[in-house]
Structures are given as structure tokens and as C-alpha cells.
Amino acid sequence: YSQVARPRF
């Protein structure tokens, strides 16, 4: 995917 927001753990 392009420009994907990574979930904060």
C-alpha cells in the first residue's frame, strides 16, 4: 500500500 498509516502499539 502507498502512504499507509502505521498503527501505534
From Swiss-Prot:
- List where in the cell it is found: Secreted
What is this protein's tissue specificity according to the annotation? Widely expressed in the nervous system. Expressed in corpora cardiaca, hypocerebral ganglion, frontal ganglion, protocerebrum, antennal lobe, tritocerebrum, thoracic ganglia, esophageal nerves, recurrent nerve and frontal connectives. Not detected in corpora allata, circumesophageal connectives, subesophageal ganglion, abdominal ganglion and abdominal perisympathetic organs.
Keywords (A to Z) from UniProt: Amidation, Neuropeptide, Secreted
Its predominant location is secreted
Q: Which residues carry this modification: Phenylalanine amide?
A: 9
GO cellular component terms, alphabetically, are: extracellular region
**A single GO BP:** neuropeptide signaling pathway
What's the family? Belongs to the NPY family.
Q: Its biological function?
A: Accelerates ovarian maturation in females.
Q: What is this protein called?
A: Neuropeptide F
User: What species was this sequence derived from?
Assistant: Schistocerca gregaria
User: Which lineage ranks, top first, belong to the organism behind this chain?
Assistant: Eukaryota, Metazoa, Ecdysozoa, Arthropoda, Hexapoda
